[in-house]
Amino acid sequence: GATIMPGTLWCGKGNSAADYLQLGVWKDTAHCCRDHDGC
């Protein structure tokens, strides 16, 4: 399974977000990870 940093849904291997707009508790960090995943 995916390993995601606690408090985020996008930082780590894969993501656990239900959709693109879902970020988790640490929104600024998750936003950066989500943008990086899209590269």
Swiss-Prot record:
The active site is at H36. This is Phospholipase A2. Coiled coil: none annotated. InterPro entries: PLipase_A2_dom (IPR016090), PLipase_A2_dom_sf (IPR036444), PLipase_A2_His_AS (IPR033113). Binds 1 Ca(2+) ion per subunit. It comes from Bunodosoma caissarum. Its EC number is 3.1.1.4. It catalyses: a 1,2-diacyl-sn-glycero-3-phosphocholine + H2O = a 1-acyl-sn-glycero-3-phosphocholine + a fatty acid + H(+). Its main location: secreted.
